């Protein structure tokens, strides 16, 4: 059965029901409730006429219809206007006892005559094909059908009850048509096929009400008369721009739909969003910045991965920003914006919020491609988080933060910006992060690569966690900023400039930054700790000396110096006792350490060492297998309870250069190798100020150096006095002489 025939057949049941609601089975009355009935013999009904309505059909109509409806019904020749007298045809009423009457038209409709008709089991007879029109009591046409075919009613009812019967239900073709369609009764339901005629998006179920209401272009359909239709929705967040007439062809301007949905959300619940469905949408410019609002949500189709949002927006590049707002709280999510600068150079940005003195912004799953202006522009942020955002081939700033200088609240900076899970590639001219003066802010898991200007974080306070910069021509500017960085990845010459500059805004008493990496910690500031210890602990709980390999030193540059301190005391079980110390090498000390000094030469290394107190080691050996590497071995003293190893160097670390100095620890008991490239470090010590001092050499000599005095100036006739010394364990007296008075 063709769709048009199905609709006509369905209307025949509705119209017939409406007609007989006015007919009494007591056809003996010539006038009943305003109806005119003329008695006729049963054979007055033409042979080709058929029953077009019976009491059973009444129960197919909604109770709301026949309970409240009042109006007039016209039945005429098929294909004509039945409201014209010349087109009317005969309509007969036949009751269960065979009584027949001719019904005058138009037929007045009311609920009382319907009840009597049902009680009398009456039937309505007329031609099998006819036209009909139904008007309300204000003579307003509810519907008009030019060709009703009654003989399909039973077949239609049977097919409608089948599993696929839903396919037979009619739909209103467009939102414009819905506005003009009058509900049969309050609470009547219809289905809209599509917002635009010929489409199947933006449709849905609507409920009719017999009261006036203002049309909003998507949720309420109204022609301004005394009725309206309301969209059926169990979740307002599921309403999208399709429901307000947007077209996802990337060409038709969706601004009217965006404005309509925005006003609908503001009038119903400001926390509702302008919800884009999946697709490609063109928008010229959405500018509502002239009026302050509290809430604005702008969202695309839900996604979990911001790399490829299902909603793409494009524009013509003519406006400064695609979206310009003045809102305190903003949510922006699940949108890809293509600026199309590769096809048409322009300076259009994506989003700008001008609300001063505190903005709350939440962005997620955003992608910016080929944007000529600022992608995200914010001012006076108070709480801002942007997660899963991506940009490529942009020429404007990707994220920019500025301030309004509002006096109340001292708004000369931004606060609490968090940027997480982002990737930016191949951007030029503009800055990726143009965010100076941002305090209490965070960067987490971001990657900026092959971009001309990574950004400006100057005069800010940032926690930077897992930021990667690769192949960027210019540094990430962070002049005078307080940075706490961890796991920073700088590749292909990229770097962060955290130096001081002339425009310092933060307090000079709070200067400093830290950087924590797997290869080291860099602190630009003071360190305050409870105690200091080494990660290497050495022990020798035996009466025998033992060789121990500390590790390998790699230092690329000639002249680099290393100092290894082995801190610990041998002979831990015996204290210094109560006797005076008589031997610097053999007597017991409380405490001890050995200092090993190494320097990279043109070819290999040189080393010397000295001790203080009860030395934890008795010898040092090093190798020179190649110019830049040396292995260091120490002979542990017997009964070494514990010792720690501390290392210092002048060599370049990983914070300075990629090919940096390195200490590869071994920390195992191991005999040193043999051969000509194995050397014993000499035992040398000196303490001086460049003019005078003391020392000791590897031959066991004490070295003393002081200013020379001419003998003629010394009174040598007698000693002025004596001082006590212990030489090689023996206490002796050493005389000293005074200078002559005239000298």
From Swiss-Prot:
Keyword Signal recorded: yes
Pathway participation: Glycan metabolism; exopolysaccharide biosynthesis
Signal peptide per UniProt: 1-27
Family: To R.meliloti ExoP.
Keyword Magnesium: no
Entry keywords, A to Z: Exopolysaccharide synthesis, Periplasm, Signal, Virulence
GO biological process: polysaccharide biosynthetic process
Role description: Involved in the biosynthesis of amylovoran which functions as a virulence factor. May be involved in the polymerization or late modification of the repeating units.
Record localization: Periplasm
Protein species of origin: Erwinia amylovora
Superkingdom classification of source: Bacteria
GO CC annotations, alphabetized: periplasmic space
Lineage: Bacteria, Pseudomonadati, Pseudomonadota, Gammaproteobacteria, Enterobacterales
UniProt protein name: Amylovoran biosynthesis protein AmsF
Primary localization class, coarse: periplasm
């Amino acid at each position: 059965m063709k769709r048009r025939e199905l609709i006509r057949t369905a209307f025949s049941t509705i119209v017939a029901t409406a007609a007989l609601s006015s007919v009494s089975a007591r056809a003996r009355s010539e006038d009943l409730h305003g109806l005119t009935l003329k008695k006729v013999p049963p054979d007055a009904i033409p042979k080709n006429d058929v029953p077009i309505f019976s009491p059973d059909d009444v129960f197919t109509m909604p109770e709301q219809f026949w309970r409240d409806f009042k109006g007039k019904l016209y039945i005429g020749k098929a294909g004509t206007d039945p409201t014209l007298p010349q087109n009317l045809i005969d309509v007969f009423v036949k009751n269960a006892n065979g009584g027949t009457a001719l019904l005058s038209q138009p037929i007045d409709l009311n609920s009382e005559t319907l009840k009597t008709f049902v009680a009398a089991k009456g039937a309505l007879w007329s031609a099998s094909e006819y036209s009909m029109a139904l008007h309300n009591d204000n003579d307003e046409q509810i519907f008009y059908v030019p060709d009703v075919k009654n003989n399909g009613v039973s077949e239609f009812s049977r097919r409608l009850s089948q599993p696929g019967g839903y396919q037979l239900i009619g739909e209103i073709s467009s939102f414009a048509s819905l506005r003009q369609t009058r509900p049969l009764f309050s609470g009547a339901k219809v289905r809209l096929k599509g917002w635009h005629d010929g489409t199947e998006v933006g449709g849905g179920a609507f409920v009719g009400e017999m009261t006036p209401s203002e049309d909003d272009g998507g949720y309420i359909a109204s022609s301004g008369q005394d009725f309206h239709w309301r969209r059926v929705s169990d979740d307002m967040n599921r309403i999208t721009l399709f429901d307000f007439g947007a077209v996802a062809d990337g060409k038709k301007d969706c601004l009217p739909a965006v404005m309509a949905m925005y006003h609908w959300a503001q009038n119903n619940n400001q926390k509702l969003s302008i919800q884009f469905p999946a697709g490609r949408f063109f928008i010229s410019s959405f500018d509502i910045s002239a009026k302050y609002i509290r809430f604005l949500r702008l969202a695309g189709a839900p996604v979990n991965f911001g790399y490829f949002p299902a909603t793409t927006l494009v524009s013509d590049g003519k406006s400064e920003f695609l979206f310009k707002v003045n809102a305190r709280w903003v949510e922006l999510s699940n949108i890809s914006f293509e600026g199309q600068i590769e096809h048409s150079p322009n300076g259009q940005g994506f989003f700008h919020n001008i609300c001063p003195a505190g903005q709350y912004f939440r962005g997620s799953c955003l992608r910016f491609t080929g944007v000529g202006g600022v992608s995200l522009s914010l001012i006076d942020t108070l709480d801002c988080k942007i997660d899963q955002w991506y940009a490529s081939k942009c020429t404007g700033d990707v994220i920019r933060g500025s301030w309004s200088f509002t006096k109340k609240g001292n708004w000369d900076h931004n606060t609490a910006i968090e940027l997480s899970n982002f990737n930016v590639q191949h951007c030029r001219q503009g800055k990726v992060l143009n965010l100076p003066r941002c305090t209490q802010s965070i960067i987490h898991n971001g990657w900026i690569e092959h971009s001309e200007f990574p950004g400006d974080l100057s005069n800010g306070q940032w926690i930077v966690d897992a930021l990667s910069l690769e192949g960027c021509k210019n540094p990430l500017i962070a002049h005078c900023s307080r940075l706490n960085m961890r796991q920073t990845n700088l590749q292909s010459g990229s770097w962060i400039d955290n130096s001081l500059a002339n425009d310092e805004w933060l307090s000079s008493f709070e200067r400093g930054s830290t950087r924590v990496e797997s290869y080291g910690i860099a602190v630009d500031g003071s360190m305050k700790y409870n105690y200091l210890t080494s990660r290497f602990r050495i022990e020798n709980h035996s009466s025998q000396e033992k060789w121990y390999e500390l590790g390998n030193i790699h230092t690329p540059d000639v002249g680099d110096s290393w100092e290894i301190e082995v801190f610990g005391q041998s002979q831990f079980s015996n204290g210094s006792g109560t006797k005076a110390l008589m031997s610097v090498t053999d007597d017991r000390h409380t405490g001890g350490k050995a200092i090993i000094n190494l320097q990279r030469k043109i070819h290999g290394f040189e080393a010397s060492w000295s001790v203080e107190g009860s030395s934890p080691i008795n010898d040092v050996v090093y190798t020179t297998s190649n110019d830049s590497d040396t292995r260091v071995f120490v002979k542990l003293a017997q009964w070494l309870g514990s010792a720690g190893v501390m290392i210092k160097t002048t060599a370049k670390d990983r914070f300075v250069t990629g090919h940096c100095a390195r200490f590869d620890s071994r920390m195992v008991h191991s005999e040193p190798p043999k051969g000509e490239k194995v050397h014993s470090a000499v035992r040398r010590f000196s303490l001086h100020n460049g003019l005078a001092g003391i020392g000791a050499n590897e031959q066991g000599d004490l070295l003393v150096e002081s200013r020379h005095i001419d003998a003629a100036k010394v009174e040598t006739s007698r000693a002025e006095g004596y001082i006590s010394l212990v030489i090689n364990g023996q206490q002796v007296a050493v005389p000293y002489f005074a200078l002559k008075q005239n000298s």
